[in-house]
């Protein structure tokens, strides 16, 4: 192969003659080559600073107050520890529950996952509205009411409960938060919600001397308020 290719190179003046090639042993040793200055580094065109990745965890510069940074990190660590401890308590409680109770919890988890997927678009609409700079509790309640009127299923009502909990974390005014929880709880516990509760609830002769629907509505509102209580307690401290 070597002998067949060489004449072609010679015909094209790539190599004039095989004898003109210096012996490979005559090449100076690599250690004798002087250090080469990187002239490109002095060229403004090559003075490119690569940006830090957006997900960089630690970014320090001369203006960074290290004490403030460590204080912030401490808050995050403490919240992580609190979350872990709460999760451990819930796991312990789950293990102590009867088998039948745990099976119902598993069913609810599966159903809630389906709810989140089915009503993701409706929830995103409400999240987007709540993310605007100016909104009132009544604006949100009207939007929620419109969505519930268009969707008669129980799923969207359960999804709205999780929306209220998430929204409560963004509301810095405890009074407005209580107002929002109360108003939205009444909105969710509409006739459709009561119908579902009535269908799954066994007959109870201990219900007070008020209409069954009013009683169930009151229970529903109380349950939703309780479901969002931990969020409110976390905000107030």
UniProtKB/Swiss-Prot annotation:
Pfam families: M11L. Keywords: Early protein, Host cytoplasm, Host membrane, Host mitochondrion, Host mitochondrion outer membrane, Host-virus interaction, Inhibition of host apoptosis by viral BCL2-like protein, Membrane, Modulation of host cell apoptosis by virus. It comes from the Viruses. Induction: Expressed in the early phase of the viral replicative cycle. It is found in: Host mitochondrion outer membrane; Host cytoplasm. Its main location: host cell. GO terms for biological process: regulation of apoptotic process; symbiont-mediated suppression of host apoptosis. GO terms for cellular component: host cell mitochondrial outer membrane; membrane. Interacts with host BAK1, BAX and BID. Belongs to the orthopoxvirus OPG045 family. Plays a role in the inhibition of host apoptosis. Interacts with host BAX and thereby inhibits its activity. This is Apoptosis regulator OPG045. It comes from Variola virus. The gene is OPG045.
């Amino acid at each position: 192969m070597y002998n067949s290719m060489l004449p072609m190179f010679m015909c094209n003046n790539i190599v004039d003659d095989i004898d003109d090639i210096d012996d490979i042993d005559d090449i100076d040793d690599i250690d004798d080559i002087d250090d080469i200055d990187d002239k490109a580094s002095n060229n403004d065109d090559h003075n490119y600073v690569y940006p830090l990745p957006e997900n960089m965890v630690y970014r320090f510069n001369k203006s960074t107050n290290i004490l403030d940074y460590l204080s912030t990190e401490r808050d995050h660590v403490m919240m992580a520890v609190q979350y872990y401890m709460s999760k451990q308590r819930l796991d312990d409680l789950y293990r102590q529950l009867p088998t039948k109770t745990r099976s119902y919890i598993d069913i609810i988890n599966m159903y809630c996952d389906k709810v989140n997927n089915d009503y993701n678009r409706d929830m995103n609409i409400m999240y987007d509205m709540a993310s605007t700079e100016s909104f009132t509790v009544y604006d949100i309640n009207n939007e929620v009411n419109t969505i519930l009127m268009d969707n008669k299923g129980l799923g969207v009502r359960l999804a709205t409960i999780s929306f209220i909990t998430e929204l409560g974390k963004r509301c810095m005014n405890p009074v407005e938060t209580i107002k929002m929880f109360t108003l939205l709880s009444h909105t969710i516990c509409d006739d459709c919600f009561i119908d579902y509760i009535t269908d799954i609830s066994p007959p109870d002769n201990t219900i007070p001397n008020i209409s069954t629907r009013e009683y169930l509505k009151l229970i529903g509102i109380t349950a939703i308020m309780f479901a969002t209580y931990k969020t409110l307690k976390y905000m107030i401290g």
